[in-house]
A protein has these predicted regions:
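Well-ordered beta-sheet/strand-loop patches within structured domains
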Residues: 6-226
């Protein structure tokens, strides 16, 4: 690989800069990565755009590329527990994405909601025709919710892994496979996209049998093995 602008910029920083960052990260690692004895755990390396999954014996048994948040939408550092996975999830679009991306896209192309299989609802949960809304007047808050159907092309892909956190970020599949071929994979809104979401699902299951694995594959429109 050739040396680019970013590499030169970081090489020109003083040694004290890296020393301070090392001390900060060592302290962070000391309190952040605390797995329960005898339990599986996962580490997402944001800087390397990689994820490692470890079994109860602390053996790394799964490794894959990931996509993380962009410079404007950084993936937060956190520690949590994965509680459940959801197949073919709907995407409830965050308010900031509605305001900053979806509304401008719709104003440029009024077929945006239809093409992306998105539906609009008012605060009472009633479906609203997006053509009847004066979107231009909503510059701060938007009194509507937008939900993307759980069909092919859904931004969350075919499966999502949910865990408690104050940032509304998760691990999930993605239809945007092209990003995994990039060296810089800072392309998301903050969530972590998994290169091999199906393998990750099998890792999390206690003792998956072939029947259960095939049921998951079928739900994700993947051909069963048996």
């Amino acid at each position: 690989n050739s040396i680019g602008t970013y590499t030169i910029r970081y090489l020109n920083r003083p040694l004290a800069y890296y020393k301070d960052h090392l001390l900060i990260n060592l302290e962070r690692a000391r309190w952040q990565y605390k797995s329960e004895k005898g339990s599986k755990y996962v580490i997402g390396n944001i800087a390397a755009f990689m994820l490692q999954a470890f079994n109860e014996e602390v053996d790394s048994i799964l490794e894959m590329r990931i996509c993380c948040g962009s410079v404007r939408n950084k993936t937060p550092l956190l520690y949590s527990k994965i509680y459940y996975m959801e197949l073919n999830p709907y995407w409830n679009v965050p308010q900031n994405i509605i305001r900053k991306e979806i509304i401008p896209s719709y104003r440029r192309d009024t077929t945006y909601f239809t093409r992306n299989r998105m539906k609009v609802y008012d605060k009472n949960g009633n479906r609203v025709n997006p053509h009847d809304i004066k979107w231009a007047k909503y510059t701060a808050g938007v009194p509507f919710t937008v939900k993307q159907d759980n069909k092919e092309g859904n931004s969350l892909g075919r499966i999502i892994f949910r865990f408690p956190n104050p940032y509304a970020v998760y691990l999930h599949d993605t239809p945007s496979r092209w990003a995994f071929n990039r060296s810089n994979r800072a392309v998301s809104h903050g969530c972590v996209r998994l290169e091999r979401a199906l393998d990750f699902a099998f890792f999390l299951l206690e003792k998956p049998d072939e029947l259960l694995e095939d049921r998951i594959r079928i739900a994700m429109d993947i051909a069963p093995k048996s």
